[in-house]
């Protein structure tokens, strides 16, 4: 009975690692055909923001210029002019199809992430007892570590999150999350988030050291500052 109780939190921990991926994959597959059919049938215009409109317009202008340049090096004839118009028409249809797929992708991924968040939130609430056990195990493990190991771990974590080379990692992570939700890539938004998050984390971390760590383990703070210097 005791072994069963000990394995239950471990099983719960494993489920936390693999369950989000499985739920995301399953929900995505279940919603894909429904969202595609709903969008193509309703021909809705939602989720087409200014960034998407600008992107589509830029692609169309670029396409028109390339086709026009291609015709400039040829002899002007009625046949060529007709082919030029047909080429623009075909490529325009292709651009519209791509944009339509992007809209479906946005709705699908956004809906999938919302549903997954709701399911995982409910799963976490139902497994509150297992989370409490895992938390006690983690606290006991950290308590048994030496101050030197703790200081090294804190220093490594802070360097990864708010160190000199961290902006590139933040850019990749935020870009991945941005893409996962189906949003159109925007360098300005991602750059703003990358320049903001590390500063906020750095402020929170310094407050945590000043407020709690100094009181709980002054020796750990001394070792940390020595290693950091």
Swiss-Prot record:
Superkingdom of origin: Eukaryota
Protein's membrane topology: Multi-pass membrane protein
GO cellular component: a single term: chloroplast inner membrane
Protein location: Plastid, Chloroplast inner membrane
Protein name as annotated: Potassium/proton antiporter CemA
Protein's organism: Nicotiana tomentosiformis
An example Gene Ontology biological process: potassium ion transport
Keywords, ordered alphabetically: Antiport, Chloroplast, Hydrogen ion transport, Ion transport, Membrane, Plastid, Plastid inner membrane, Potassium, Potassium transport, Transmembrane, Transmembrane helix, Transport
First-listed, main subcellular location of the protein, grouped into a coarse class: plastid
Transmembrane region(s): 7-27, 107-127, 189-209
Catalytic activity: K(+)(in) + H(+)(out) = K(+)(out) + H(+)(in)
GO molecular function: antiporter activity; proton transmembrane transporter activity
Biological role: Contributes to K(+)/H(+) antiport activity by supporting proton efflux to control proton extrusion and homeostasis in chloroplasts in a light-dependent manner to modulate photosynthesis. Prevents excessive induction of non-photochemical quenching (NPQ) under continuous-light conditions. Indirectly promotes efficient inorganic carbon uptake into chloroplasts.
């Amino acid at each position: 009975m005791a072994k069963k109780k000990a394995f239950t939190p471990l099983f719960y921990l494993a489920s936390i690692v693999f369950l989000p991926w499985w739920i995301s994959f399953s929900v995505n597959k279940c919603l894909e055909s429904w969202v595609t059919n709903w969008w193509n049938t309703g021909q809705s215009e939602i989720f087409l923001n200014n960034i998407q409109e600008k992107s589509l317009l830029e692609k169309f202008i670029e396409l028109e210029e390339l086709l026009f340049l291609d015709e400039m090096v040829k002899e002007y004839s009625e046949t060529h002019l007709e082919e030029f118009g047909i080429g623009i028409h075909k490529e325009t249809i292709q651009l519209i199809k791509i944009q339509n797929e992007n809209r479906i992708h946005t709705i699908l991924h956004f809906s999938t992430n919302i549903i997954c968040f709701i399911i995982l939130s409910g799963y976490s609430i139902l497994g509150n007892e297992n989370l409490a056990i895992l938390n006690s195990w983690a606290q006991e493990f950290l308590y048994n570590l030496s101050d030197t190991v703790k200081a090294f771990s804190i220093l490594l974590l802070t360097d990864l999150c708010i160190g000199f080379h961290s902006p590139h990692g933040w850019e990749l992570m935020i870009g991945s999350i941005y893409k996962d939700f189906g949003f159109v890539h925007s360098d300005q938004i991602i750059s703003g988030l990358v320049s903001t998050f590390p500063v906020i984390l750095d402020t929170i971390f310094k407050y945590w050291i000043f407020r709690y760590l100094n009181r709980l383990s002054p020796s750990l703070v001394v070792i940390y500052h020595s290693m950091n210097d």
